[in-house]
């Protein structure tokens, strides 16, 4: 081992090895596929509790509600959601 070496394999040696690509040829596409399915099925909305894009506004509304009284905001929004 050379002086100052940490004993780790050089990055170039890892990336050019067959073993690296055999492992990563399966794992990398799997990660992207899992992420795509997590978002496209709507499970991400359910997991993090965020509203779905069609649930931000009620059908009768065309824009975001405006709160007119700062300290009455909760009651104004509660009235809107009923």
Curated annotation (Swiss-Prot):
Membrane disposition: Single-pass membrane protein
Pfam families the record matches: Cytochrom_B559, Cytochrom_B559a
InterPro entries, A to Z: PSII_cyt_b559_asu, PSII_cyt_b559_asu_sf, PSII_cyt_b559_N, PSII_cytb559_asu_lum
Listed GO biological process terms: photosynthetic electron transport chain
Cofactor: heme b
Record field: transmembrane: 22-36
UniProt remark on cofactor binding: With its partner (PsbF) binds heme. PSII binds additional chlorophylls, carotenoids and specific lipids.
Matches recorded under HAMAP family: PSII_PsbE
Xref: NCBIfam families: cyt_b559_alpha (TIGR01332)
Function of the molecule: This b-type cytochrome is tightly associated with the reaction center of photosystem II (PSII). PSII is a light-driven water:plastoquinone oxidoreductase that uses light energy to abstract electrons from H(2)O, generating O(2) and a proton gradient subsequently used for ATP formation. It consists of a core antenna complex that captures photons, and an electron transfer chain that converts photonic excitation into a charge separation.
Quaternary structure note: Heterodimer of an alpha subunit and a beta subunit. PSII is composed of 1 copy each of membrane proteins PsbA, PsbB, PsbC, PsbD, PsbE, PsbF, PsbH, PsbI, PsbJ, PsbK, PsbL, PsbM, PsbT, PsbX, PsbY, Psb30/Ycf12, peripheral proteins PsbO, CyanoQ (PsbQ), PsbU, PsbV and a large number of cofactors. It forms dimeric complexes.
Protein name (database record): Cytochrome b559 subunit alpha
């Amino acid at each position: 081992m050379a002086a100052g070496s940490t004993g780790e394999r050089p990055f170039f040696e890892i990336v050019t090895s067959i073993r690296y690509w055999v492992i990563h040829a399966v794992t990398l596409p799997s990660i992207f596929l899992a992420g795509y399915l997590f978002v496209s099925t709507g499970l991400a909305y359910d997991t993090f509790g965020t509203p779905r894009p069609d649930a931000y506004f009620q059908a009768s509304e065309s824009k975001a509600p405006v709160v007119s009284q700062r300290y009455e905001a909760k009651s104004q929004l509660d009235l809107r959601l009923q």
